[in-house]
Regions:
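Non-catalytic signal-transmission and effector/linker regions of two-component phosphorelay proteins
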Residues: 1-29, 249
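His-Asp phosphorelay/catalytic-motif detector in bacterial-type signaling
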Residues: 25, 69-71, 96-101, 212
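Positively charged, aromatic-enriched patches within helix-turn-helix-type DNA-binding elements
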Residues: 168, 172-238, 242-245
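Active-site beta3 strand of CheY-like receiver
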Residues: 68-74, 79
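Basic, amphipathic DNA-recognition helix from helix-turn-helix-like DNA-binding domains
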Residues: 80, 85, 89-94, 99-156
Length: 253
């Protein structure tokens, strides 16, 4: 067997993401009700080679995405009809869309707003006012995580089965939907059973681009993973907290 490339877990999710050197442009769905901002976002993304569809409300976004799945969503939170938070929740609950990255671009900029955005499944959170060049860089950074080939080997720990090629998590024989970031983080833990990792180590190893995430982001994702894999998330069997050090993944005895 060939040696597994170092840090391949950075890029889990390539099955849905288009490569930049592909003849098909990556498609971005932008939901923004301010026409000046939407024109600015469209201009900079299209200038960088992306195909962009802009929506001023959330009404038709999901139905259009199911017909033509985008590479990434850029969502304002405060839009008419189905707002950005509801759209993100719907994306994460919709088969075929659940692993598509979501970036919030919003005037809601408090720490509580950022944490809520991450908790419901966002992959990045950009407060307004924003730099268009930074937005394009963030879009590229999120897509880069998923653009390379996946390792083929599935993994099983206790009742948890991880199939990176299909990006499928099963727990007790039941398929459990995850976001791309949740999947990468869980896979990283499961391939290093028994090792303790600090939050900073996990940020460097799993997120790769750490410009928008903080150690608290790791806690948010750990809590969400526990809700999906643990019979009792308050008393975890698999994903344990090591006080003062970080987290450790354990195989059940």
């Amino acid at each position: 067997m060939n040696a597994m490339p170092k840090n391949w877990y950075w890029v889990l999710g390539a099955s849905y993401c288009l490569h930049y050197n592909n003849s098909v442009k990556p498609s971005i769905f932008v939901v923004e009700d301010d026409p000046d901002i939407s024109r600015l976002v469209r201009h900079h993304l299209e200038n960088d080679g992306f195909s962009v569809r802009v929506y001023s409300t959330g009404a038709n976004v999901i139905s259009d995405a199911e017909r033509q799945r985008p590479s990434l969503f850029v969502l304002d939170i405060m839009v008419p009809g189905k707002d950005g938070l509801e759209l993100c929740r719907t994306v994460r609950q919709t088969p075929g869309l659940a692993s598509v990255p979501v970036i919030f671009l919003t005037a809601k900029s408090s720490e509580a707003d950022r944490v809520l955005g991450l908790e419901i499944g966002a992959d990045d959170y950009i407060p307004k006012p924003f730099s268009p060049r930074e937005l394009v860089a963030r879009v590229k950074a999120v897509l880069r995580r998923f653009e390379r080939p996946l390792p083929p080997s599935p993994l099983k720990v206790g009742d948890i089965a991880i199939d990176p090629a299909a990006m499928i998590l099963t727990v007790g024989g039941q398929t459990v939907p995850t976001t791309a970031t949740e999947f990468r983080l869980l896979d990283y833990f499961a391939r290093h059973v028994g090792r303790v990792f600090s939050r900073d180590h996990l940020l460097d190893s799993v997120w790769r681009d750490t410009s928008y995430v903080t150690p608290r982001s790791v806690d948010v994702y750990v809590r969400r993973i526990r809700e999906k894999i643990e019979p009792d998330p308050e008393n975890p069997r698999y994903l344990k907290t090591v006080r003062g050090a970080g987290y450790r993944f354990e195989a059940p005895k």
